[in-house]
């Protein structure tokens, strides 16, 4: 019995289909082996400790190739400075700085909507719009001074440092504009403070110092100023609502890092992760619990 063209085409088609199925099956087995190999290699690089979030990967490791600015909590200006140090602000030689502080206080900005927790109604309220510009200039520095000097000695300090990824560091004008937008104002001890009001009135919530010694800022030469790192710090006991104040401090540090190409670090000079921030909040809760127990 002769095989016709139709039968030959059927046989050839079956062979081709079988070959395609076999090739697909072979590729599938090979792909599974490669995928498993990649997964095994990636998981072998994950550190054992917590904090392996996206924040610890990528460009943050670039800083390990050069020496970071050294910062200890002892380098930060004391929140309970002596009266002699506070008098420096009122010397005639600081007249130009006071003028710049007054100009900074006049910058009109809206409050940042930063806190994830409900805010106290009067915690971050704006200053009275009925204040005249002259009164603002004359009262801004005394208000800042009185609120800082009245703080008790800090028993615990929460520190968030922002280290520049650029070799040139943070430039003075850009740094000044950024922190003014976050509501910080230049004041006592030649550093910046964040008060209840964006205009610089009310109690001090937290402060920002130069992380490079001597730890201060020179507004007279701010156009030529630069620094490799700055440190935000909040002392306990301190503001009446420390958890809300801490949230504002975190937002200000993140804003600076995002806009000026910086990297967030904790008080141990490790990358600031979500777990670290939560640990800071827990320290605040524990401090408030201890303070309440002592009052009893």
UniProtKB/Swiss-Prot annotation:
Signal peptide residues on this chain, from the entry's feature table: none
Keyword Nucleotidyltransferase: no
Alphabetized UniProt keyword annotations: Cell cycle, Cell division, Cell inner membrane, Cell membrane, Membrane, Transmembrane, Transmembrane helix
Chain ranges on the Cytoplasmic side, renumbered to this chain: 23-296
Skewed-composition ranges (Polar residues): 135-148
Coiled-coil region(s): none
Membrane-topology annotation of the record: Single-pass type I membrane protein
Annotated Acidic residues bias: 123-132
Major location category of this protein: membrane
InterPro entries: Cell_div_ZipA (IPR011919), ZipA_FtsZ-bd_C (IPR007449), ZipA_FtsZ-bd_C_sf (IPR036765)
Family named by the database record: Belongs to the ZipA family.
Protein's recorded name: Cell division protein ZipA
Organism: Pseudomonas putida (strain GB-1)
Protein encoded by which gene: zipA
């Amino acid at each position: 019995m002769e095989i016709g063209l139709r039968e030959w085409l059927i046989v050839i088609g079956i062979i081709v289909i079988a070959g395609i199925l076999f090739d697909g099956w072979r590729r599938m087995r090979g792909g599974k082996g490669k995928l498993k190999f990649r997964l095994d290699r990636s998981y072998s690089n994950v550190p054992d400790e917590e904090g392996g979030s996206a924040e610890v990967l990528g460009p943050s490791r670039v800083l390990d190739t050069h020496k970071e600015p050294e910062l200890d909590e002892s380098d930060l200006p004391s929140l309970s400075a002596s009266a002699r140090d506070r008098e420096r602000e009122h010397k005639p030689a600081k007249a130009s700085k006071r003028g710049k502080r007054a100009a900074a206080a006049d910058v009109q900005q809206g409050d940042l909507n930063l806190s994830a927790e409900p805010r106290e109604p009067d915690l971050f309220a704006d200053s009275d719009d009925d204040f005249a510009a002259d009164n603002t200039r004359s009262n801004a520095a005394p208000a800042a001074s009185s609120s800082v000097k009245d703080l008790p000695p800090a028993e615990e300090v929460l520190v968030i440092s922002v280290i520049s990824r650029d070799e040139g560091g943070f430039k003075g004008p850009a740094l000044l504009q950024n922190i003014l937008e976050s509501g910080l104002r230049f004041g006592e001890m030649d550093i910046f403070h964040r008060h209840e009001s964006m205009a610089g009135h009310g109690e001090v919530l937290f402060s920002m110092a130069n992380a490079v010694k001597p730890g201060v800022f020179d507004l007279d030469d701010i156009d030529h100023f630069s620094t490799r790192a700055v440190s935000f710090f909040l002392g306990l006991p301190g503001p009446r609502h420390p958890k809300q104040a801490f949230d504002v401090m975190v937002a200000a540090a993140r804003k600076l890092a995002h806009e000026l190409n910086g990297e967030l670090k904790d008080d141990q000079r490790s990358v600031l992760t979500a777990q670290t921030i939560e640990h800071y909040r827990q320290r605040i809760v524990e401090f408030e619990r201890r303070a309440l127990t002592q009052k009893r």
